């Protein structure tokens, strides 16, 4: 058993992680942080060590490895096979239906009436949920559009939902949510837009999105730092609680690319702790984390 002094000395050296079940040295964390930044743009500071430890440990166990150093070596030599698992492990997927409700109110009260008036000929609406996580955001968009366009015939409405994490993209495609993920929804919305199903665990309740909502959405994996295959432009882009993991230069590049992908006067919605101030001048602020492209 380590003495108290030994533990203090280890903490002082920054290598207290070396005494855990699966040792992780500073060099291991530095490699993981560097790889995360290279492949995804995500910045992992030292304060993220606990989080990274708990997430990568699952991969170490599944691969029957003994240390983080072994995992780092494995990742170096098996990048094609392991990189997707690595990225899935380090990404954060916190979301809920109608999160930041004022965004959906603005969409319903301001954006949709404007688009109905402006796109009378094409009758097209194109929206991108960038960083869609497990699908709550794009399905919230679909519910909003389905309700708002119920009296408007012939509209072609499509939501592109993308994320870096293949697991959450699959979850979104499936569209099944356990009870606690829908607890905040009014009973009327639940009844209108979900079908009760047997959860995979066989315990409790689960709800699947109705087919009339699934038809609006296309789920795809996409690394925001890679080339984008989309050809057409969007009326609205939601990119919320994504850029907080990027440095300022990466944020600027990303927001400028979003501006290029938006139609004239298109709308960008970002997360509550994010801002475009000091990052790009291609948008004007319309209120709390809501922006319009300057055309």
For the regions a language model picked out, list residue spans one by one.
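Conserved AdoMet
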Residues: 2-128
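Conserved class I S-adenosyl-L-methionine
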Residues: 123-135, 158-160
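Class I S-adenosyl-L-methionine
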Residues: 273-295
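Conserved SAM-binding loop of SAM-dependent methyltransferases across substrates and taxa
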Residues: 134-152
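Conserved beta-strand signature within the Rossmann-like core of class I S-adenosyl-L-methionine
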Residues: 265-272
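Extended basic-aromatic, gly/pro-enriched interface segments that bind polyanionic ligands
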Residues: 151, 155-238, 242-246, 250, ...
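A short glycine-rich, Lys/Arg-flanked "PGG" loop and its adjoining helix->strand segment in the class I
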Residues: 252-264
């Amino acid at each position: 058993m380590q003495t108290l002094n030994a533990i203090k000395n280890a903490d002082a050296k920054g290598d207290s992680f070396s005494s855990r079940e699966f040792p992780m040295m500073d060099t291991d964390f530095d490699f993981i942080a560097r790889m995360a930044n290279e492949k995804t743009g995500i910045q992992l500071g030292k304060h993220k060590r606990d989080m990274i430890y708990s997430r990568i440990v699952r991969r170490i166990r599944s691969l029957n490895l003994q240390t983080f150093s072994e995992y780092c070596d494995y990742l170096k030599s098996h990048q094609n096979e392991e990189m997707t698992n690595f990225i899935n492990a380090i990404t954060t997927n916190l979301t809920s239906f109608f999160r930041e409700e004022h965004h959906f109110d603005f969409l319903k009260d301001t954006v949709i009436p404007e688009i109905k008036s402006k796109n009378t000929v094409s009758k097209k609406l194109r929206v991108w949920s960038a960083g869609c996580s497990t699908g709550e955001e794009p399905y919230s968009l679909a519910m909003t559009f389905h309700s708002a366009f119920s009296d408007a015939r012939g509209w072609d409405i499509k939501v592109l939902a993308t994320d870096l994490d293949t697991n959450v993209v699959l979850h979104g495609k499936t569209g099944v949510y356990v009870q606690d993920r829908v607890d905040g929804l009014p009973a009327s919305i639940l009844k209108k837009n979900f079908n009760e199903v047997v959860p995979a665990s066989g315990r409790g309740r689960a709800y699947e999105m109705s087919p009339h909502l699934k038809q609006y959405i296309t789920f795809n994996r996409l690394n925001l730092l890679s080339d984008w295959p989309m050809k057409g432009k969007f009326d609205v882009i939601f990119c919320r609680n994504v850029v907080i993991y990027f440095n300022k230069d990466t944020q600027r590049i990303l927001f400028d690319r979003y501006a290029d992908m938006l139609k004239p006067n298109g709308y960008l919605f970002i997360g509550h702790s994010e801002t475009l101030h000091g990052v790009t001048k291609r948008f004007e602020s319309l209120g709390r984390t809501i922006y319009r492209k300057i055309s």
